[in-house]
């Protein structure tokens, strides 16, 4: 795992400060034991605690995105469980990313995934479907 916060939160992998400990969907829901959908509804309703957690999450995600952009200089597609909820927050996230990126003046390289759920399963299925079609 990539370290986001040296000496930070303990990650399930055993290390401390991994990006996963700060940017996984569980960061948003573990304390309240609610679903991600319930959490995002609270954010929409401007629930104080949910908004605070969301802003911290977006800040950590922005740092991670900026680091990845600096390292790889390529488009970044945001997926996973949270990716399906990011479309309405891309302007805010893009602005946060720009705070950490002194070399670029826009975040057009930042994209939201097309598949809102189970994107990896769709990708695997697509691979085998294409292979099958070639045999016809």
Predicted regions and their residues:
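Short, intrinsically disordered, charge-biased short linear motifs at domain edges
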Residues: 1-4
